[in-house]
């Protein structure tokens, strides 16, 4: 949520302290450190440093011991030395150390072969050699018992082993120089490392067997001059401290650890290794797969992977994964942590790592200048609310209450409260007497049911209004979403796409008469089915939403009614809706005297005013016209406020499926067996602010770029002189919002010591053929909004708690409500490398898929071109193909079961384009949560939407004599959907999406047919990979049948249309199957084995380190209690409804 009132973004690092710590650590390593005043203290503690250094050299971090044991065992058959994991690295055990090490102390830039780095006014700017990642030919997996999927390149063990040696022992000297020491006489050449504990399984409070949050562990190594990559990774996933210390040993926190360990090594120099040096075979001795994947050589000087970037994994089902990355682009580093979270989730069970965005979304409305709380809090009592919230609120003598945590920002008022802007008061009765408190801005006034009212300044019109936010929420979850598909946008505030105008009339008298004629019309016989409904527009019992629908032609209305409303000029409709939104009963029909125009030069003007203030009108962009530059703009309803959103996910999500029978407090289950609880794995979000190139449009990014402490990449640095020239263009300078503009002006004025600055609209210049162009992949790390504004986060959950009548001591659960994935579409295009990109132009704005077709979408995850990476096509299963080190059937099995257990329905929205001619950017991604949050729960169900004509099956389409089945594309929204549900947002909802917008085949049938064939061919090709590599055998029965049908058109006589096949996806059939029960038993067996192993490790540690006995004995008691429960029959009954653990990886193991 965009909020400038909550102070700065990142905590400011104490650079002096961190530099002193860096000096101390370098001294302990026996290395030279930069000489400056703050280093003098080191001389005093030199003897102590020597003692620490000597002890440090003799210790091995427990994670490294686990990793080394795995490597020794895994490569034993190779008959070559296994390299030792370096134990003399510079360990980043304090947040911010990596940032300090990225530059020499008194320099503001550092340049090397792999990176150009700058200290800038807003933080740090790092521009790596490549400005984006590629996924083509990048992902290599070492041979093991677990099959290497056909979409990855299989690497012989000997090749990985030699790469590992070359990574650690062969790094070039200049790569090892730590920038902080670059100016020293003897620069320190060393590896730098970071220990992390990223979340894998969210904890579920109060639920036995699920209550402990579980993390994996990971040790990340980089050559010294790439320390900025660790600064980046730490900023996203946190810092788990020094891995050598017992207090940080994951195995001594057994209930918080999945039992899995990982390592990652950056080694860009490996692109210079030859295939022969790696031990790849000559082509004459290569297998067919090695020839196909070019993992063999003809000439001795052939480079491994043709000298291009690659990531190489070594893993099996034992729970250890090691990765070598031959590049230093930040995206690869982040995605590597994602890969290891995914690996751990798939082996552990219960959980999924999801490529998802998501937000708690609560509808919000303009309540006008006065309102009565009783109409929003029916059935709730202030006294009952107080009783259930004794620990979190303080009741005042006057009869209202304040929050204990945020007493100035959250005030609780009785259900009979009356809010009035005119006298700035909230009045209510207490002990038989009327009480009044002051109504002030920036305060949440909370009714007993959680409904929140805020005094809001609309800013541009200077009009104050009451904003009402409902406590009922929809957690919109956007999984399986391709790059550029709108993961971040689902949680962004739509206000950036809204702009405001004023209302005008040509002839006040004539237009007021026309409005009155509309008000006087009899609308009671409008329904085509003959139903009579009294509906005078100004009747207080008739809502603004009803009036919007009444004034919009619809198939539900008679032809006569539709003709009448279609003949009303748009300006009259707008004026009628404006008057309805302002109208009060006490006006007694006299609205005309309240709406005025000024007299100018003795004549009536044209600008409409209410209470001497201009009447505003708001508009929203929904895509572009066919010229792809002109905005398609639509007027918003007069009571519209953007939904109140709390971001829950952005890119990397850990989720757990919990049986609803185990939850301690109620949720909206609708009788479903389980629900999904999500947690964001990231502390900061790697944002690509595409719209920031338009000055003044992306307010959040411009605000972020005005404050210090940021990690920024792929922007163009400006010196003070360059910025001075840049700001001379005053017209364009003032197109920025105030924070960005002032930041630039302050820099030019020399108000700080920074040598460089970046502008949010000017991305890094990169080579494109023979010219320089702005990078299409600008990035920065944004602090999570929910962490930046804890009061807003607290208020969101408090409102939900009050609405559910839960006490403040009971656990509150906010599971996923709606699954709304995203696809990125494109017309036929020619890429910059000259390659033709086929169209992906069959999707309407929103589709619903039944499970088989939804799984087909997830298996192929097709996408159009995205600024994040090179190329287009399939992103692999659940869009995680490139980042999944285990066979994708494990993820797909989990996804299918999750949808079944939770009873979720799969919707998919469009980004970039709808059909070949309507460019929509991310406007649909922003719009869908607004609509979904305003729908009732039963209205979100596909069955209801289909029965009422709001969803229609995609039709079969014939082109050049060939018929393309609509079944593959599921269902899509209809014109009736837009009229009915868009009416909660737009004044003229039927104008937003014309027929060809909703039916892309009407835009260009030839492109539609080509798109369909592209999807069909991709479906077949991707499915065939599962058959070729044998991993189809790891698929659960319904998924296995689907993959074979995609590959071959049939399976055991069944096609996709067969009743027998579709019944395989029935929830009861699946949850009563033997293969599902096996998953539950597998989870139990694995957990019992892990807990026994944990006990052995705890006892061994006590024997070796008696000083830890008191702490570890408590852990032992907790583990024994957990073990007793997990070993019981009760546990198996309790976890029925979860996804259990997929046994397939373990069945692959030969020992």
Swiss-Prot record:
GO cellular component: cytosol
Keyword Lyase attached: yes
UniProt entry keywords in alphabetical sequence: Coiled coil, Cytoplasm, Decarboxylase, Lyase
Subcellular location: Cytoplasm, Cytosol
GO molecular function terms attached to this record: phosphoenolpyruvate carboxykinase (diphosphate) activity
Disulfide bonds: none
EC number(s) on file: 4.1.1.38
Catalytic activity, reaction form: oxaloacetate + diphosphate = phosphoenolpyruvate + phosphate + CO2
Parts forming coiled coils: 1083-1129
EC category: lyase
UniProt superkingdom: Eukaryota
One of the GO biological process terms: protein heterotrimerization
Family in the record: Belongs to the PPi-type phosphoenolpyruvate carboxykinase family.
Function: Inorganic pyrophosphate (PPi)-dependent phosphoenolpyruvate carboxykinase, which regulates the carbon flow of the central metabolism by fixing CO(2) to phosphoenolpyruvate to produce oxaloacetate. Can also produce pyruvate and diphosphate from phosphoenolpyruvate and phosphate.
Subunit structure as annotated in this protein's UniProt entry: Monomer and trimer; forms heterotrimers with PEPCK2 and PEPCK3.
Record-given protein name: PPi-type phosphoenolpyruvate carboxykinase 1
Gene that this polypeptide is encoded by: PEPCK1
């Amino acid at each position: 949520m965009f909020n400038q009132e909550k102070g700065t973004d990142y905590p400011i690092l104490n650079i002096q302290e961190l530099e002193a710590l860096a000096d101390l650590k370098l001294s302990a390593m026996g290395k030279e450190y930069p000489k400056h005043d703050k280093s003098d203290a080191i001389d005093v503690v030199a003897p102590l440093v020597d003692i620490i250094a000597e002890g440090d050299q003799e210790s091995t971090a427990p994670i490294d011991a686990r990793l080394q044991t795995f490597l020794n065992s895994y490569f034993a058959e190779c008959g070559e030395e296994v390299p030792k994991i370096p134990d003399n690295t510079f360990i980043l055990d304090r947040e911010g150390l990596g940032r300090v090490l990225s530059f020499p102390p008194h320099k503001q830039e550092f340049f090397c072969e792999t990176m150009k780095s700058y200290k800038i006014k807003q933080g740090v700017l790092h521009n790596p050699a490549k400005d984006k990642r590629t996924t083509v030919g990048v992902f290599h997996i070492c041979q093991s018992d677990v099959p290497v999927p056909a979409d990855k390149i299989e690497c012989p063990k000997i090749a990985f082993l030699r790469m590992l040696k070359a990574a650690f022992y062969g790094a070039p000297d200049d790569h090892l120089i730590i920038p902080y020491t670059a100016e020293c006489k003897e620069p320190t050449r060393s590896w730098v490392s970071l220990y992390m504990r990223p979340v894998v399984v969210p904890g579920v409070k109060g639920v036995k067997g699920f209550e402990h949050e579980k993390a994996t562990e990971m040790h990340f190594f980089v050559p010294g001059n790439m320390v900025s990559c660790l600064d980046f990774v730490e900023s996203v996933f946190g810092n788990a401290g020094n891995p050598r210390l017992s207090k940080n040993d994951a195995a001594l926190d057994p209930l918080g650890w999945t039992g899995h360990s990982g390592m990652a090594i950056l080694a860009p120099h490996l692109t210079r290794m030859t295939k022969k040096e790696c031990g790849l075979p000559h082509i004459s001795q290569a297998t067919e797969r090695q020839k196909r994947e070019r993992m063999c050589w003809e000439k001795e000087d052939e480079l491994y992977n043709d000298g291009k970037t690659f990531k190489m994994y070594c893993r099996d089902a034992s729970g250890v994964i090691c990765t070598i990355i031959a590049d230093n682009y930040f995206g690869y580093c982040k995605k590597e942590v994602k890969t290891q979270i995914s690996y751990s989730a798939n082996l552990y069970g219960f959980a999924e790592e999801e490529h998802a965005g998501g937000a708690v979304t609560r509808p919000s409305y303009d309540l006008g200048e006065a309102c009565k709380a009783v109409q929003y809090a029916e059935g709730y009592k202030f006294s009952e609310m107080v009783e259930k919230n004794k620990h979190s609120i303080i009741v005042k003598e006057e009869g209202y209450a304040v929050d204990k945590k945020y007493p100035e920002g959250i005030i609780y008022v009785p259900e009979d409260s009356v809010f009035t802007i005119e006298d700035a008061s909230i009045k209510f009765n207490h002990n038989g007497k009327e009480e009044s408190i002051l109504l002030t801005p920036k305060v949440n006034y909370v009714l007993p049911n959680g409904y929140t009212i805020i005094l809001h300044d609309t800013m541009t019109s200077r009009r104050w209004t009451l904003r009402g936010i409902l406590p009922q929420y929809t957690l919109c979850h956007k999984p399986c979403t391709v790059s550029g598909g709108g993961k971040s946008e689902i949680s962004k505030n739509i206000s950036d796409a809204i702009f405001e105008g004023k209302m005008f009339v040509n002839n006040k008298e004539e237009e007021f008469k026309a409005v009155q004629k509309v008000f006087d019309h009899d609308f009671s016989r409008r329904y085509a089915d003959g139903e009579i409904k009294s509906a005078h527009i100004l009747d207080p019992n008739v809502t603004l939403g009803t009036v919007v629908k009444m004034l919009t032609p619809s198939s539900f209305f008679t032809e006569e009614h539709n003709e009448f409303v279609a003949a009303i000029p748009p300006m009259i409709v707008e004026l009628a809706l404006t008057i309805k939104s302002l109208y009060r009963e006490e006006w007694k029909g006299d609205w005309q005297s309240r709406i005025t125009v000024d007299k100018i030069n003795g004549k009536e003007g044209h600008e409409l005013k209410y209470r001497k203030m201009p009447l505003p009108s708001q508009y929203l962009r929904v895509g572009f016209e066919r010229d792809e530059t002109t905005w398609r703009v639509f007027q918003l309803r007069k009571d519209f406020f953007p939904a109140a959103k709390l971001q829950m996910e952005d890119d990397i999500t850990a989720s757990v499926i919990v049986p609803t029978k185990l939850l301690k407090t109620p949720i909206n289950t609708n009788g479903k067996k389980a629900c999904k609880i999500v947690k964001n794995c990231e502390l900061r979000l790697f944002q690509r602010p595409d719209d920031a190139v338009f000055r003044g449009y992306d307010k959040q990014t411009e605000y972020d770029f005005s404050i210090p402490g940021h990690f920024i990449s792929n922007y163009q640095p400006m010196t003070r002189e360059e910025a001075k020239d840049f700001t001379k263009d005053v017209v364009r300078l003032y197109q920025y919002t105030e924070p960005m503009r002032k930041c630039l002006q302050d820099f030019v004025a020399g108000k700080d010591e920074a040598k460089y600055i970046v502008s949010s609209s000017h991305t890094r210049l990169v080579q494109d053929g023979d010219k320089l162009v702005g990078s299409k992949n600008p990035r920065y790390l944004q602090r999570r909004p929910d962490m930046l504004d804890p009061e807003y986060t607290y208020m969101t959950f408090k409102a939900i708690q009050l609405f559910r009548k839960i006490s403040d001591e009971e656990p509150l659960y906010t599971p996923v409500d709606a699954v709304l994935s995203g696809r990125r579409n494109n017309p036929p295009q020619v890429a910059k490398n000259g390659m033709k990109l086929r169209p992906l132009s069959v999707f309407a704005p929103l589709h619903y898929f039944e499970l088989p077709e939804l799984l087909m979408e997830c298996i192929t995850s097709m996408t159009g071109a995205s600024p994040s990476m090179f190329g287009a096509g399939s992103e692999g299963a659940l869009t995680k193909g490139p980042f999944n080190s285990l066979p994708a059937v494990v993820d797909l099995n989990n996804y299918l079961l999750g949808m079944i257990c939770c009873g979720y329905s799969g919707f998919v929205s469009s980004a970039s384009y709808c059909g070949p001619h309507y460019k929509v950017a991310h406007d649909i991604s922003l719009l869908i949560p607004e609509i979904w949050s305003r729908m009732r729960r039963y209205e979100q169900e596909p069955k209801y939407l289909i029965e009422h004509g709001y969803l229609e099956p995609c039709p079969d389409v014939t082109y050049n004599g060939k018929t393309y089945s609509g079944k593959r594309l599921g269902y899509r929204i209809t014109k009736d959907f837009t009229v009915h549900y868009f009416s909660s947002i737009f004044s003229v909802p039927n104008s937003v999406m014309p027929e060809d917008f909703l039916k892309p085949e009407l835009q260009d049938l030839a492109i539609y047919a080509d798109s369909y064939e592209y999807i069909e061919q991709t479906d077949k090709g991707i499915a065939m990979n599962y058959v070729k590599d044998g991993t189809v055998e790891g698929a659960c029965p319904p998924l296995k049948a689907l993959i074979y049908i995609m590959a071959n058109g049939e399976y055991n006589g069944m096609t996709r249309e067969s009743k027998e096949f579709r019944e395989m996806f029935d929830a009861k059939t699946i949850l009563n199957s033997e293969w599902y029960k096996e998953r539950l038993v597998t989870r139990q067996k694995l957990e019992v084995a892990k807990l026994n192993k944990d006990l052995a490790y705890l006892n061994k540690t006590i024997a070796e380190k008696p000083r830890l006995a008191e702490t570890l004995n408590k852990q032992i008691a907790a583990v024994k209690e957990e073990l007793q429960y997990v070993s019981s029959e009760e546990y198996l009954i309790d976890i029925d409804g979860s996804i259990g653990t997929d046994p397939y990886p373990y069945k692959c193991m030969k020992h």
